[in-house]
Amino acid sequence: MEDAVRKLLNSADHEVLALANDARAIEQLKVRFLGRKGELARLFKEMGKVPEAERPAVGKVLNEAKVRLEALFAEALERGGEQGAGRREQIDITVPGRRPPRGRLHPISQVAREVCRIFNWLGFEIVEGPEVELDYYNFEALNIPRDHPARDMQDTFYVSDDVVLRTHTSPLQVRTMEKRRPPIRVIAPGKTYRCDSDVTHTPMFHQVEGLMVGKDISFGDLKGILTIFVHQMFGADVGLRFRPSFFPFTEPSAEVDIQCVMCKGEGCRVCSQTGWLEILGSGMVDPEVFRMVGYDPEEVTGFAFGMGIERITMLKYGIDDLRLFFENDFRFLRQF
């Protein structure tokens, strides 16, 4: 019996050593040696064949073998578990990595940057200002006094009697001219707010305001700058026209239309069969605005223009619903 026990222990030692750090295989080996129907249990069953006088000694040998086997497998399982976990945590730096998905700029951000790039190229500097604006800068300094009918044209978010969420980026015209002397050539991109929400309007939208002031600035300069912008943004083959309009802070004023990008000027549902689409408003700075900032309208002239970035983006990419920009739908955003 002692020889059988010795062989059993030697076999267990060798097989555990051969399996090294394979915890699952060691667990299976433990069942084979220590399980209810295992090798050691078979030897215990043979105790009945051992002479009664020898049974105490044989029983002691078998119990010692059981303790030794339990210790052997416990140590092997602990070692195998630790080293197996270590292997799982190791990183093979020679294996090619998985490239994470790249983010993209929102289409409005892309177009806003493109607009700024074009005007930077034309020599315009970017200026910024507060979105929560004083009524004075948003209206009065732009030739829109409290009793002016033009105030009815804009649905305004009022923070208090004299503070509003700016309805346009035009206040940057006044703020810039208050701080600087001509010549001035700036654009002011930013968010604006109005109480309006439908397929073509949202309560928050983006605008870019432009201002150029100096000696002998003419409407011809305005037309030249905006013609270059349109051709850079939409292509050199896109026609444009200047249509008389009204804005309280410019005189004369004009809307700028481009040939419909959908039908190439032939007439379609998007352009209401006219072949033209409005993209921005513009005009020569009203002398009264110059006086509000301390400029002499007899010495300087200038022009201003303003455009909605959402409008430009919709025309550039053929988008027919403004609300798509704010729904965070990956199916839409991944196209840009």
From Swiss-Prot:
InterPro entries: aa-tRNA-synth_II (IPR006195), aa-tRNA-synth_II/BPL/LPL (IPR045864), Phe-tRNA-synth_IIc_asu (IPR004529), Phe-tRNA_ligase_II_N (IPR004188), Phe_tRNA_ligase_alpha1_bac (IPR022911), Phenylalanyl-tRNA_Synthase (IPR002319), tRNA-bd_arm (IPR010978). It catalyses: tRNA(Phe) + L-phenylalanine + ATP = L-phenylalanyl-tRNA(Phe) + AMP + diphosphate + H(+). Its EC number is 6.1.1.20. One of its GO terms (molecular function) is phenylalanine-tRNA ligase activity. Mg(2+) binds at residue 251. This is Phenylalanine--tRNA ligase alpha subunit. Keywords: Aminoacyl-tRNA synthetase, ATP-binding, Cytoplasm, Ligase, Magnesium, Metal-binding, Nucleotide-binding, Protein biosynthesis. Its cofactor is Mg(2+). It is an enzyme of class 6 (ligase). The keyword Transport does not apply. SUPFAM superfamilies: Class II aaRS and biotin synthetases, tRNA-binding arm. One of its GO terms (biological process) is phenylalanyl-tRNA aminoacylation. CDD domains: PheRS_alpha_core. The gene is pheS. GO terms for cellular component: cytoplasm. Pfam families: Phe_tRNA-synt_N, tRNA-synt_2d. Binds 2 magnesium ions per tetramer. The keyword ATP-binding applies. It comes from Syntrophobacter fumaroxidans (strain DSM 10017 / MPOB). It is found in: Cytoplasm. Belongs to the class-II aminoacyl-tRNA synthetase family. Phe-tRNA synthetase alpha subunit type 1 subfamily. Disulfide bonds: none annotated. Tetramer of two alpha and two beta subunits.
